Amino acid sequence: MRCISRPLPVRVACRKRLWVVGRILLQAGAETLGPAATIASMFSYRHSFHAGNHADVLKHTALVVILRYLAAAKDTPLLLADTHAGTGLYRLDRADAQTSGEALEGVLPLWQQYGPGAEGQASAPEALAAYLHVLAERNASGELRKYPGSPFIAAALMRPQDQLRLFELHPTDSRLLDKNVAGLSNATQIEVVRNNGFTGLKALLPPASRRALVLIDPSYELKTDYAQVVACLQDAMQRFATGCYIVWYPVIPRQEAHQLPRRLKALAQQAGRSWLHATLSIGRGAQESGRDGLRASGIFVINPPFVLQERLKEALPVICRTLQRGAGHGWQLEGSP
């Protein structure tokens, strides 16, 4: 494993102050306040509070299907890249996850009903079963305590000839990611890069093997993240149009969020590439307010494997039924002709 650190436009001594400033800027509308606000905002998001939520379930179920297909399709080496990697591995039994309780509306009910030894294990749709199997490999005791993020899912399914590149700009998370990855048996195939994944991705494409899977999933704390996703993907497709690209996004009452899938669809159609769009909403209980956290999210995949739509069509009804909280729950799935 190699860990590469890129210089940040702020001094290390200022990090603690940036955490405080980041919270203030977010409340004030940081997206209008320039580069310093952007840096502070990036430092304020910690995925450890959200690990294993319904958004992770959607994203990681699709990721497992795609990775398994690509690994089996050809022996040619595959480049895997995650633009916003986080720490790679999370503990659901520790304070961050316990405080938010988001896994209780995500992976935990699925694990209890369809995980190892559960009554419904044999009836789990193939995509859901494969996803839970990856989690089980990290939780030999049968209790779901450790949750592998996208980097660890990719590491679990990659082959000896594949390479994994992980971008993480957050100073604390990048150090934790480096430490977590170092303990993997295939760590020599993985490179941790402390850099902005939107820009860092450019140096990787096109890969020498002409095969790549790229996951783009920023926190979207800033409105500018949506435009950066589109710009990043447009640049990536100009460099390597045949790669498989997964974009995750939150479904929230913000114009940029509503426009994003339409912009991605237009981008794929202009390039003549196939696409798939899936959303999952757990709805909202009668006693829950509009401030009770994220209720829905979506993924947009360019150049998806042909099996992905069918696998999600089987899995999403089961996932939605298990996780639904009330009014507004549902799922949608559409793909290119």
Question: Where are the language model's segments positioned?
Answer:
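Class I S-adenosyl-L-methionine-dependent methyltransferase catalytic core
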Residues: 35, 39-337
